[in-house]
Each structure stands twice: as C-alpha cells, then as structure tokens.
A protein has these predicted regions:
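Membrane-proximal intracellular helices of multi-pass ion channels
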Residues: 1-479
C-alpha cells in the first residue's frame, strides 16, 4: 500500500474543503450570524493540517486500483467528519451523531434529514447543507483530479473508484481533461438553473440552495414543506433540471461535440426517459381525484417521479397520502435510480438493463443450449468483467439491505418505515414512506440506527465496494 500518496491526496481534500467552507462563512458574514466563527475555526484547522500534508510530495507515485479504492473511501470519510464540525461547534446540531448523519446525507446527495424544520436553522448552516450536495454530486475526487499533478495514467484509478455506474469511460484521451469537461458541464448547468430560478422571482439565497440541491440531486430543503410553497413555474423548472442532472454527462459531451447520432443511440437514456414518462402517466391517472384538474395531477406526478428516479428527494406534496399504486411506483423508482455517469444515485438504469439482458440471455440458452449469444449495450459487447461486477454488486446490495433492515428493526417502528428508510438511504433518495415521508424526518431513529443508515448512504454513494474494502485485512498490506 502506497500510504504516502494516500496521505498526500487527503491533504488536498482538507484544503479543498476549507476553500468550500468560505461559501457558508461569507454567508454568515452577510447575515451577521455567530455560526461564522464555527466555520472560521474549521477552515483554519483544515488548512493547518492540509497544507503541511500537500507540501510534502509523495516518495512513490505508483497508484493502482487498491490505492484508488482506499483513497476514495478515506477521502469521503475525512470530508464528512470535517464537514460535520461546524454543525456541532455552532450549536445548530449539537449532537455529534445527528450532525454526522446530516452531513453524510448532504455529501452523499441523499437528502434524508434529522431536522423537523430547516427554516429554523441559520442561513450559513442551511447553505452548507445544500452546498454539500453540490460538492458531492459530481464527486469531490473528480474535482481533485483537475488539480492533482499525478502522472503515468494513475488518475483513472481514482475516477473508477468514485464514479457511479458499472463502468467508466474517458471522454478525452487524458482522464484529467475528462474531469475538467465534466465539471464545466456541471457548472454550466448549475448556473443556467440559478438564472431560470431568479427569472421566476425566487430570492437569490433560495435560488442558490435550490440549485445546489437540484444539481447534486440531493434534496435538502430550507423550508419545512420542501418545494411545496414555491410557484408552479419554479416547480416546473426544478422538475426539468432534476431530470437533466439524472442524464449521463457523457451524453451532454457528445451533444456539445455534435455527435448527435451517438448520443441518441444510448439505450440507458432512452430507457430513462421512457420510465419517467410511463411512471408519471400511471401516477397521474391514479391520483387524478386528489387534485383540481388533470394538469395539476400531471405536474405533481412528473415532479415526484423526477425527484425520486433522480434520487433528488424534493417534494411538492405529501405523497405518503397517495394511493397504494402510486406509492408502490415511487418505491420501485427508488431502486431504479438515474443514469450512470450522472449525479443521481440508485442502482442505475444501466445496471438494470444489463441484468434484464442477462436474464433474457439465460432464457434463450435454455431453449438453445448450444447458441453463442453476447450481451450488448449500445451495439457494443459487454465484457465478462462488467457483467460479473454487476452481478456481485446486486448480491452485496441485497445483503446490505437485509442486514440494515434487521438492525434498525430493534427501534420497533413499522416495517414500511424500516424498509423505506434503508432503501432510500442506500439509494441516496431522501424521503421514505410512513413515519419518514415528506412531512417526517429521520430524527426518530436511535443513535445506532442513524449510524447504520449513515453507513448505507456512504456505501450507496460509493457504489458499495470502496467502503467495504476497508474492512479487508489484505487491503492494508504493503507492496
């Protein structure tokens, strides 16, 4: 294990987080909040540790898959621990476990909260909650890749470990250039969203918080009713951009480079939009009687479908009160998730497509035992390694779901609450059903359950394996 390069990157993480904390720090100055002192202390502590770590160049620059996985997991753990400090120091969330849960939910873009009324929080605390979504949405290490002077193609090992989806492709020959392109698209879409929200009359502060949450597909609200009190225009804009941020960013690159046929050939994106439209239409007909007219039902259905499938987690209405059919569709969308290579969470459309194709292949082989049939995606054969990783992912995923439900069941809540709490955190969605619906919160759980759900959020965001590999003894052996 090359510890020197890992420590070096962790130093970069602390320095970058210190810079990011200037956003809530400046907000505290503008609104004259005492919480600014908590951010100042945290920033100085980060720099005091981070600067010496990056000033000492690593003796070895060899950086392989093992280092990539370990660095990714440790980077997120450091990011989370440091990010929770201002919550505790400011007294906004004095309980360390609650603060830990809240910031894990922020950085992993989950949006599950222990707060019953976010509007009672200081402005600086709320913008840090929302900004953590934006930081975690594209991935902090993807941003670090644009800065790190690593050579020898080692960047790819970091990108593979953090990027969502069954496989990672390079848009450009250099991984560092790919990371820069992804962030440029991310920033451009975020700015566009802020402009549209401002044009709708949303205050600047609200626009920033909403844009950070939407871009990162996080869903932290600054009001107790999430997006329910905003105008129809704002809700439509949020709906559109939630769906856009759930699209594989590679598609945007192809569109920008005028490779339209290649972009339109994406099976995952076509399936993604089909699922959204089909789900929204089914829910519309199912909840029509709850609204004044069919258009309102359609708008509410599209908002909630877009929010859940992209794992954003915003709400405009209490869908906990919707008929069983609609609630079932939303739970299924929780598992589904957005596209690979997007800021969305969940299992991912691409994995589900691969699993469906795998089942179809096996059924075909039952009928034609001697046939040779390859699984293809977008016209290209899928490698055995990708299929093996997809199958193992699903097995581990189900094991974590089962274990987590068992542990939190000791809190003696109903099965719907326990089940949806686990799947909504593991898939980085946010709200669940029953006691943790849009009008509820996760403050009801015991400290142990909050830690279990925090683990689920982090494991889900990192695609399970980087966090699990920390528990293997051979991970920590030297070369």
């Amino acid at each position: 294990m090359n510890y020197s390069i890992i420590i070096y990157i962790l130093g970069w993480i602390m320095n970058v987080e210190a810079v990011c904390m200037l956003v809530p720090g400046i907000t505290a100055l503008i609104y004259r909040e005492k919480s600014g002192i908590a951010f100042l202390i945290t920033i100085l502590a980060c720099l005091a540790i981070g600067v010496p770590l990056v000033s000492r160049k690593p003796s070895k620059k060899a950086f392989y898959s093992r280092e990539g996985l370990v660095t990714t997991a440790l980077s997120w753990i450091v990011l989370i621990i440091v990010g929770a400090v201002p919550f505790v120091l400011s007294g906004a969330i004095p309980n360390p476990i609650d603060a830990f849960f809240e910031i894990v939910s922020g950085f992993t873009t989950t949006g599950s909260s222990i707060l019953s009324d976010p509007s009672q929080m200081p402005y600086s605390i709320n913008i840090w909650r929302c900004f953590s979504h934006w930081i975690g949405g594209m991935g902090v290490l993807v941003f670090i890749l644009t800065l790190l002077p690593l050579a020898g193609g080692y960047h790819m090992n970091l990108m593979k470990a953090e990027s969502p989806g069954p496989s990672v492709g390079k848009l450009l020959p250099k991984v560092q250039s790919t990371a820069k392109v992804l962030y440029k698209i991310y920033i451009a879409l975020t700015i566009a969203l802020i402009i549209f929200l401002l044009l709708g009359g949303m205050p600047l502060y609200d626009s920033l918080c909403a844009a950070f949450g939407t871009a990162g597909t996080g869903g932290f609200g600054i009001k107790s009713d999430s997006m329910g009190s905003y105008s129809l225009y704002i809700q439509i804009v949020i709906t559109i951009f939630m769906i856009l941020f759930g699209v594989n960013f590679n598609v945007y690159f192809l569109l920008l480079t005028r490779k339209f046929s290649q972009a339109l050939k994406s099976e995952e994106v076509r399936c993604y939009f089909f699922v959204i439209i089909a789900s929204a239409l089914m829910i519309t007909f199912n909840v029509r009687h709850l609204f004044d007219n069919v258009w309102e039902a359609l708008q509410q259905a599209f908002f909630q479908v877009g929010s859940i499938i992209t794992t954003t987690g915003y709400a405009t209405t209490d869908f906990n009160q919707w008929p069983a059919v609609s609630r079932t569709i939303l739970v299924l969308l929780t598992f589904c998730g957005a596209c690979a290579g997007s800021t969305g969470g969940g299992i991912k459309i691409s994995r589900l497509l691969l699993l469906a194709k795998s089942v179809r292949k096996e059924l075909h082989l039952y009928l034609h035992p001697n046939a040779v049939k390859k699984i293809k995606m977008d016209g290209k054969a899928v490698s055995h390694e990708v299929m093996r990783a997809t199958n193992i992912y699903m097995i581990v995923y189900l094991m974590i779901v089962a274990a987590s439900i068992f542990i939190i069941s000791f809190d003696e809540f109903d099965l719907v609450t326990n089940f949806t709490a686990v799947v909504t955190t593991l898939n980085n969605v946010g709200p669940g059903l029953s006691l943790i619906g849009p009008t509820g919160n996760f403050g009801i759980f015991s400290p142990l359950s909050k830690l279990v759900l925090s683990f689920d959020m982090l494991a889900g965001r990192l695609e399970l394996f980087p966090i699990l590999i920390l528990f293997l003894r051979e991970t920590w052996k030297k070369f």
